[in-house]
Curated annotation (Swiss-Prot):
One Pfam family hit: Trehalase
Protein name per Swiss-Prot or TrEMBL: Periplasmic trehalase
Gene designation: treA
Region forming the signal peptide: 1-30
Enzyme Commission (EC) number: 3.2.1.28
Keyword annotations from UniProtKB, A to Z: Glycosidase, Hydrolase, Periplasm, Signal
One biological process term in Gene Ontology: trehalose catabolic process
SUPFAM superfamilies named among the record's database cross-references: Six-hairpin glycosidases
Database matches in PANTHER family: TREHALASE
GO cellular component: a single term: periplasmic space
């Protein structure tokens, strides 16, 4: 006797399971068809630990990026023999057996360049090509040229690249945009996901998932052909983020997936390893030792997962904003990540429709709708009036307002009335003379006050514009651009982050000195310049007087000016 046909709601409930089971095979296949390179801390074992603990280099990333001159097993064997001999010199041993990363030549821009000219001149300076790498290099080869952030960041970074690509597109370099999308697709095919950066020690984690948005950007130039071409890789990346969901029970978490008590599926940041990060080895060990009440492996995992978030580090992840060892990234459901997952599902639906698979498109729409409901239910703080992260330990939405709260607006997942409240909260609590504060907390960490970061400025600007909040959007763009221009006028460079409590000052805090270059700042600056100035009269520098925003959707006109605040 046949079972009765399930009702429509039951059918819809089965859809996600079907997708997850089908695509889980994709991620497994990707992992099985490639040999995952081992990171230097595994290849070199005790030698790596000893070199990093000896602090031979001011930046721990230096030795993580060093290339062994011969088989690491042979180097390690030699080290074991020599290390206890009289007069052994560890620095000399390293210099003989490794090729250290070269410091890039300091770029000196031509005199008299405008801000736009400076950025356009930087694209070739920041472009790298690594089709082939040394056998034991931590650098992962990529088939096409790519643009790096700059400074100590000698490799391509995942979420940085999206904002860099916005600038490349604005400059008309669609060939470079296409190359970078192809590189990320290559990584998905080879490793099952896009790593934090193209280094072996970054393979255990990803970063905020912007690949689908990169494909959507490329589609602005190539049309639906880009969506069709990269649909398989977008599906594989989605499978990576949802890996483990098919066996998850209510109230459980598995890797990057969280299933709440009512069955709502959301995501969190996660790193597959629970050891010190090779690029910050000594710092991580010190952080773990400073809190003997927690297992070191737990702290290492949360440090790594914070790096996966892109916000390394921030009071956002900590119980005590002044103590990094209280961070617990893996027990927090981030509002920005889930907004990006919603956007990924929407783009997957669009791409599925482009290839004529309407059934699959409807399935992704169902997943996106379910996630949107989850965002509205769990990631909105009704008492405070803003979006926030959800705490898996307290089973409550957190109270802290951060710039991540603008992501639901950026991806058009926010309710209209809530977007209005977000505009008020942003202007009241985060807007500063030099742009948007990352948080309102001063912790000494780089993803806290008083630092402002280019990608968050753009997310906020675009998100607020999506909901007609143009005055606040203009405030953010103008304040940040003024900061960038003043810094450029004084130092002739763009930097990684800015102090937004004033204008004309680079940001501070964190594990390393301020870096210049800088990929995502360049990209966002170009987008904002073209936002505030009409296309028929583009500006090469930030105008001396502030354009007035309009209540309409028209571009902000340069001629309608008021005195600069």
């Amino acid at each position: 006797m046949k079972s009765p046909a399930p009702s429509r709601p039951q059918k819809m409930a089965l859809i996600p399971a079907c997708i997850f089971l089908c695509f889980a095979a994709l991620s497994v296949q990707a992992e099985e068809t490639s040999v995952t390179p081992q990171p230097p801390d595994i290849l070199l074992g005790p030698l790596f630990n000893d070199v990093q603990n000896a602090k031979l280099f001011p930046d721990q990333k230096t030795f993580a990026d060093a290339v062994p001159n011969s088989d690491p097993l042979m180097i390690l064997a030699d080290y074991r023999i020599q290390q206890n001999q009289s007069g052994f010199d560890l620095r000399h041993f390293v210099n003989v057996n490794f090729t250290l990363p070269k410091e890039g030549e300091k770029y000196v821009p031509p005199e008299g360049q405008s801000l736009r000219e400076h950025i356009d001149g930087l694209w070739p300076v920041l472009t790298r090509s690594t089709e082939n790498t040394e056998k034991w290099d931590s650098l992962l080869p990529l088939p096409k040229p790519y643009v790096v952030p700059g400074g100590r960041f000698r490799e391509v970074y995942y979420w940085d690249s999206y904002f860099t690509m916005l600038g490349l597109a604005e400059s008309g370099h669609w060939d470079k945009v296409a190359d970078m999308v192809a590189n990320f697709a290559h990584e998905i095919d080879n490793y099952g996901h896009i790593p934090n950066g193209n280094r072996s020690y970054y393979l255990s984690r990803s970063q905020p998932p912007f690949f689908a948005l990169m494909v959507e950007l490329l589609a602005q130039h190539e049309g639906d052909a880009a969506l069709k071409q990269y649909l398989p890789q977008m599906q594989k990346e989605y499978a990576y983020w949802m890996d483990g969901v098919e066996n998850l029970q209510a109230g459980q978490q598995e890797k990057r997936v969280v299933k709440l008590q009512d069955g709502t599926l959301l995501n969190r940041y996660w790193d597959d390893r629970d050891t010190p990060r090779p690029e910050s080895w000594v710092e991580d060990i010190a952080t773990a030792k400073s809190n003997p009440n927690r297992p070191a492996t737990e702290i290492y995992r949360d440090l790594r997962s914070a790096a996966a978030s892109g916000w390394d580090f921030s009071s956002r992840w900590m119980d005590n904003p002044q103590q990094l060892n209280t961070l617990r990234t893996t027990s927090i459901v981030p509002v920005d990540l889930n907004s990006l997952m919603f956007k990924m599902e929407k783009i997957l639906a669009r791409a599925s429709k482009a290839i004529g698979d309407n059934a699959m498109a409807n399935q992704y729409e169902t997943l996106a709708n379910a996630r949107q409901k989850g965002i509205e239910k769990y990631l909105w703080n009704d008492q405070q009036g803003w979006y926030a992260d959800y705490d898996l330990k307290s089973h409550k939405v957190r109270n802290q307002l951060t710039a991540a709260a603008l992501f639901p607006l950026y991806v058009n997942a926010a309710a209209k009335d809530r977007a209005s409240k977000m505009a008020t909260a942003t202007k009241t609590h985060l807007l500063q003379p030099g742009g948007l504060n990352t948080t309102s907390v001063k912790s000494g960490q780089q993803w806290d006050a008083p630092n402002g970061w280019a990608p968050l400025q753009w997310v906020a600007t675009e998100g607020l514009q999506n909901y007609g909040q143009k005055e606040v959007a203009m405030d953010i763009s103008w304040h940040f651009l003024t900061n960038v221009q003043h810094t450029y006028d004084r130092e002739k460079k763009l930097v990684e982050k800015y102090d937004v409590s004033t204008t004309g000052t680079g940001g501070g805090g964190g594990e390393y000195p301020l870096q210049d270059g800088f990929g995502w700042t360049n990209g966002v600056t170009l987008k904002m310049l073209d936002l505030i100035c009409p296309k028929e009269q583009p500006c090469d520098n930030v105008p001396a007087t502030r354009p007035l925003s309009e209540s309409t959707t028209q571009p902000l006109k340069q001629k309608e000016a008021e005195p600069t605040p």
